Amino acid sequence: MALTLARPEGNGPGGGNLALFYLETRDANGALNGIRIERLKDKLGTRKVPTAELLLDGVPAEVVIGTRDGTRHIAPMLQITRAWNSVTAAAFMRRGCALARAYAHERSAFGAMLAELPLHRETLADLETETRAATLLAFELVELIGREEAGDIDDANRALLRLLTPIAKLLTAKQAVATVSEAIEAFGGAGYVEDTGLPALLRDTQVLPIWEGTTNVLALDAVLRTDAASGLAAMRARVAAALNGAPAAVAGAADLAVRALEHAEAWLAATKDRNALQTGARRFAFTLGRALELALLVEHARWALVRDPVCDAVQTARRFAATTIDFIRDGDHGG
C-alpha cells in the first residue's frame, strides 16, 4: 500500500487543493496496479532504496480524509520520517567514528599508532563530540514523538515537538555529512577506495540534508511558523530543566547554552521584516539546535558523573561548548 497526494477533478491549482489518497500498489495477482515505472533514477547514493518516476494511470484509490488539504493531512507522516532521518544521521556518524577509531589502533604513521598521535586523537575526539550531541538531539525528538503517540504529552511539549522536528532533522543531517567526511579522511587514501565501503557511506550520508525537506526549507519552517513563540517558550523550559543542577565543571557550557537561546529569541522578536527572517532562518535554526544539544550534553554529564566520577561526559560538553553555538548576527533585522 501507499499514500499519495493527488488533485481531485475540479479542484483548482495550489497545494491546498491536493487530497490524500490510499492506494494498493499491486493487484490480486501481484502485478503493479495501474502503476508504470517510467525510469529508475541514477542516484549518487542510497542505491539499495530505488527511486523511480512512476506514472499512475487508472490506479484504484480512496480518499483518506476530505478532498483538500492533503499536504496538511500527510504532515504527521513527515514528522516520523524526519525523526527517522535524524536517527539515521546519528547512526551514520557513529559508524564513521567507530571505523575511524578502530583503524587508528591498527594503522601506524611517524613511528606510532595513529591513536597515539596527539592531532589524530584530537580529531577523533571532535568527531565523537559531534556524534554524541547529534544522538542526544535525535532521541530527544524520538522521546517527544513517543509521548505524543502514547497520549502523554502536554501543550508545551507538543509545541516543542513541532519546533524541534525541523530543527533536529536539519542539524543532525548537516552534522552527519561533516562528521562522516572527516571520518573517511582519517583513513587517508584508503577512505577513497570503493572496495572499503567507505565512499558508499559518505554517498548515503549526503542524502540526509535533502530527504524530507532541505536545510533551507526546514529552517523556514522553524522561523516562519505561527506558533514559534510557544515552541521557543517550551524549548527555554526544556533547556532550563536540562541545566538544573549542572556540575560546576560545566557551568560555563550551561551559561553559553542559555545565552545562545536568548540571543535567538531576541533576534526573532526584533526582526519584523519577512525577508530578513528568511535570510537569517538558517542561523536561527542552527543556534536553537546547537544550544539544545549543548544543554543535553550538560544534562548527560550531570547524570553520568553520579554513576562514574571519572567519565568523559564533562570533557565532551566542554569540547562542544568550544565550537560555534550561536550563529545569530546582531543587527541582521532588516528594514
Mark where each language-model region is:
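A short core secondary-structure module
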Residues: 1-34
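Generic, well-ordered alpha-helical scaffold segments in large soluble proteins
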Residues: 5-8, 21-24, 55-63, 77-80, ...
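A glycine-rich, basic-preceded beta-loop-alpha segment at the flavin cofactor/substrate interface
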Residues: 26-34, 38, 43, 50-81, ...
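Secondary-structure capping and boundary motifs in well-ordered enzyme cores
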Residues: 45-48, 82-85, 116, 120-133, ...
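N-terminal leader/propeptide and maturation segments of large enzyme subunits in energy/redox metabolism
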Residues: 120-131, 138, 147-154, 244-253
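C-terminal helix-coil-helix/basic helical segment that borders enzyme active sites and/or dimer interfaces
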Residues: 132-169, 185, 265-281, 299-311
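Alpha-helix capping/hinge segments and adjacent helical runs
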Residues: 162-238, 307, 319-335
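C-terminal amphipathic alpha-helical interaction region
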Residues: 238-335
